[in-house]
Regions:
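Conserved Radical SAM active-site core
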Residues: 1-117, 125-128, 139-143, 150-151
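Hydrophobic faces of well-ordered beta-strands that scaffold small-molecule active sites
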Residues: 61, 94-96, 118-120, 156-160, ...
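Active-site beta-loop-alpha junctions enriched in small/polar residues
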Residues: 66-68, 99-101, 121-125, 161-163, ...
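Surface-exposed cleft-lining segments at the edges of enzyme active sites
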Residues: 69-71, 127-135, 155-161, 220
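Alpha-helical scaffold elements within enzyme catalytic domains, especially in hydrolases
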Residues: 86, 109, 148, 152, ...
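Short acidic/glycine-rich loop or secondary-structure boundary segments that cap or lie
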Residues: 128-129, 166-169, 193-195
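Conserved strand-turn element in the central/C-terminal portion of the radical SAM core barrel
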Residues: 147-168, 219-223
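Auxiliary Fe-S-binding modules of radical SAM enzymes
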Residues: 171-281
Length: 281
């Protein structure tokens, strides 16, 4: 994923029962000792109590970088809640990423974490496509949970990811979420590893008219679609009076201001360029 850099990733579980077909975290399976396919196992983490949490004051922690911290198992085991209880009073800036409205259970703790924000992954408004891709809660529940958190004064992010070319309607999702979020993150679909063939097979079966587009992007490396979508979303933002930036997660607008749209389409190119420049230094 092209998620913004944080000081500490935190994942209360190994594995994720949401079983997203495009999950970049599936590489974690090889470290798990499991034979089951990714998405069909979950290991519950236990850890020693955090000592002197205040020493992390000012650091950023991202909860849910390679698992969903509010997958159904959390209702039983409560490891994410246990983590948040330890972080209250630490001074850490906490970001949570989820596809579940179970996060609402922990509003009492999240509201005690200054600067906390909760992101919801939404890459379609089509419930049929959503159910083909993940086993998380329906989209309406995600949007409702986003609103409840935002209404409670907690910063929220609509994470439009992964954007499926020809399928994900970015402006439509922004319209559905703009009254209940502070940030909109945009991340393109990256196909790598074992799930590339699965996703391309799905497109061939369910959306054959898109096969030439997917071949151009994912077999030939053509970036035209993303450049054109960048122009389209920028024009939409200008029409709607929304701030639009690339690869910059530092924007802090007033809570009641319209959401800032952050485009991460070109994050990998920027990282490669930085490495190249660094190599010549």
């Amino acid at each position: 994923s092209n998620l913004p850099v944080c000081d500490y990733p935190a994942n209360p579980y190994v594995g994720c029962s949401h079983a997203c077909r495009y999950c970049y975290a599936s590489f974690m399976k090889r470290f798990s000792g499991h034979d089951e396919p990714w998405g069909q196992f979950v290991d519950v983490k236990r850890w020693k109590p955090l000592k002197n949490a205040r020493k992390y004051d000012g650091k950023q922690v991202f909860v849910g970088s390679v698992c969903d911290p509010y997958m159904p198992e959390e209702a039983e085991y409560g490891r994410t809640r246990a983590l948040l209880e330890e972080l209250v009073g630490s001074g850490m800036e906490v970001s949570i990423q989820t596809k579940s409205d179970l996060v609402l259970r922990d509003i009492d703790l999240i509201s005690q974490l200054p600067g906390a924000r909760v992101g919801f992954s939404i890459n379609t408004l089509d419930e049929g496509f959503r159910s083909d891709m993940d086993a998380a809660v329906p989209l309406a529940r995600r949007l409702a949970a986003m609103k409840e958190l935002h209404d409670a004064g907690i910063r929220t992010t609509c994470f439009i990811s992964p954007i499926f070319p020809g399928i994900t309607d970015v402006p439509a999702i922004i319209e559905a979420a703009r009254d209940r979020c502070n940030l909109v993150w945009l991340e393109n679909l990256n196909l790598r590893g074992g799930f590339k063939a699965d996703i391309l097979g799905y497109i061939a079966e369910k959306r054959p008219e898109l096969v030439p587009l997917y071949d151009a992007i994912y077999q030939k490396g053509d970036r035209t679609y993303w450049r054109e979508l960048d122009v389209e979303v920028r024009a939409y933002a200008e029409r709607e009076g929304l701030e639009y930036v690339r690869d910059d997660d530092t924007v802090r607008s007033p809570f009641d201001a319209p959401p800032v749209i952050v485009n991460y389409f070109f994050h990998e190119e920027i990282k490669k360029s930085a490495k190249k420049e660094g190599g010549h230094a």
